[in-house]
């Protein structure tokens, strides 16, 4: 089958998709990938055809404001700007690029990263089937849940349901604005009507969800076409970096992820918090070749850019993370308890899911104090319920194949 696959040019989106591409090629499918130009070599290493964004405005994920100057603000307004400028704003260009590629490569199906809204538009414009791969937690509205993005657990009882109704009412202006922005984007490529923005990236026919029910809130209205597949391991790029010494004491990994990698947000507070603790601390900066964290590294800590996770994770006792979805699934698949500092985008939702599942502690901020990090780490190391919570769904979060 000739497959056209569209993925947003973010490391956290590209990594799981590389595994999908490698598996599709192993099964003798003809795959063409469409993404930002900086990922050309990553996919070329898998032996697949690659086309960079052309009509869609390409960008550097580490300097988004250079292309989209309205982005980068904290809070709900910052999230709104990100959605409108990066994801909705590039969708018409994606649709034009992808529609041309459908003809050029003779694509029989378009597969889209859930945030690549041009993929669904392309399916409408060309008439070919559309499959979604959700590389972020499920964020579509549900009668059982509060609005997404607030990092709140499902409501309990009458007061909880009243809370959710009030929150949905308060969110209505933002929801309406996004719906109008997306409708304008659709009109740019000659489309009218369509689904609300909140579900526009999800194929009703086939949506592949990373994660599992073990870390996803129960929904009575989950569409039949949605399927959980656990985590999607990356392919095609080895994790470099060193190995930290092991002194027979607890080992704690600290990671800021691969997006918004300012070490002042989480790495430095954690190093300060654990400097006097009887633990070994492993730090990953998330930027290849970058080892500077802006402070002297304590004697019990080792800093590297990336780690070989399959080789390293089994030797760990806990992880302090900013809550990137791919990393969170990988840590939980290993049964590691987490301390999560989820500050923006989908990370507050991920942190909330971790605490709801019993697998860790939600610090409720992306800029925690050292004292808060220290208390949380000591707690997850001392209380076996967190490791048990992480372990309960570990098998379900592992890759399921298919």
Predicted regions and their residues:
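C-terminal "capping" alpha-helix adjacent to the active site of nucleotide-linked donor transferases
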Residues: 368-385
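N-terminal subdomain of nucleotide-sugar transferases
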Residues: 1-53
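A short, well-ordered alpha-helix in the C-terminal region of glycosyltransferases
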Residues: 385-399
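A donor-sugar binding/catalytic signature common to diverse glycosyltransferases
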Residues: 21, 110, 305-353
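Conserved nucleotide-sugar donor-interacting segment of glycosyltransferase catalytic cores
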Residues: 88-161, 214-216
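Conserved nucleotide-sugar donor-binding subdomain of glycosyltransferases
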Residues: 66-119, 161, 165-203
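Conserved nucleotide-sugar phosphate-binding/catalytic loop shared by glycosyltransferases and other
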Residues: 34-79
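Donor-nucleotide binding loops and adjacent catalytic segments primarily
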Residues: 211-318
């Amino acid at each position: 089958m000739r497959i056209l696959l569209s993925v947003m040019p973010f490391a956290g989106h590209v990594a799981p998709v590389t595994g999908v591409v490698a598996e599709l090629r192993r099964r003798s499918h003809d795959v063409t990938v469409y993404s930002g130009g900086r990922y050309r070599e990553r996919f070329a290493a898998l032996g697949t055809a690659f086309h960079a964004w052309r009509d869609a405005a390409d960008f550097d994920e580490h300097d988004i404001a250079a292309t989209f100057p309205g982005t980068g603000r904290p809070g709900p307004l910052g999230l709104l700007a990100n959605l409108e400028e990066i994801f909705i704003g590039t969708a018409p260009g994606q649709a034009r690029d992808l529609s041309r590629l459908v003809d050029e490569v003779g694509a029989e199906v378009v597969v889209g990263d859930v945030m690549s809204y041009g993929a669904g538009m392309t399916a409408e414009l060309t008439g070919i089937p559309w499959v979604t791969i959700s590389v972020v937690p499920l964020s579509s509205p549900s009668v059982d849940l509060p609005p997404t993005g607030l990092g709140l657990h499902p409501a309990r009882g009458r007061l909880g349901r009243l809370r959710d109704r009030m929150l949905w009412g308060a969110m209505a202006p933002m929801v309406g604005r996004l719906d109008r922005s997306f409708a304008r984007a659709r009109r740019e490529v000659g489309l009218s009507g369509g689904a609300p923005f909140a579900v526009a990236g999800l194929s009703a026919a086939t949506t592949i969800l990373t994660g599992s029910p073990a870390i996803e809130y129960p929904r009575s209205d989950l569409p039949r076409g949605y399927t959980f597949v656990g985590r999607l391991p990356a392919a095609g790029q080895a994790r470099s970096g060193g190995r930290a010494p092991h002194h027979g004491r607890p080992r704690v990994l600290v990671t800021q992820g691969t997006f918004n990698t300012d070490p002042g947000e989480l790495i430095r507070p954690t190093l300060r918090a654990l400097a006097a603790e009887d633990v070994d601390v492993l730090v990953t900066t998330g930027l290849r070749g970058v080892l500077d964290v802006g402070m002297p590294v304590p004697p019990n800590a080792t800093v590297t850019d990336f780690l070989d996770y399959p080789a390293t994770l089994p030797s760990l006792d806990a992880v302090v993370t900013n809550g990137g979805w791919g990393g969170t699934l990988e840590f939980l698949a290993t049964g590691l308890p987490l301390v999560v500092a989820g500050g923006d985008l989908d990370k507050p939702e991920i942190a909330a899911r971790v605490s709801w599942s019993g697998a860790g502690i939600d610090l409720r901020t992306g800029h925690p104090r050292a004292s808060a990090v220290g208390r949380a780490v000591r707690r997850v190391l001392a209380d076996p319920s967190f490791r048990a919570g992480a372990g309960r769904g570990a098998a379900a979060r592992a890759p399921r194949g298919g």
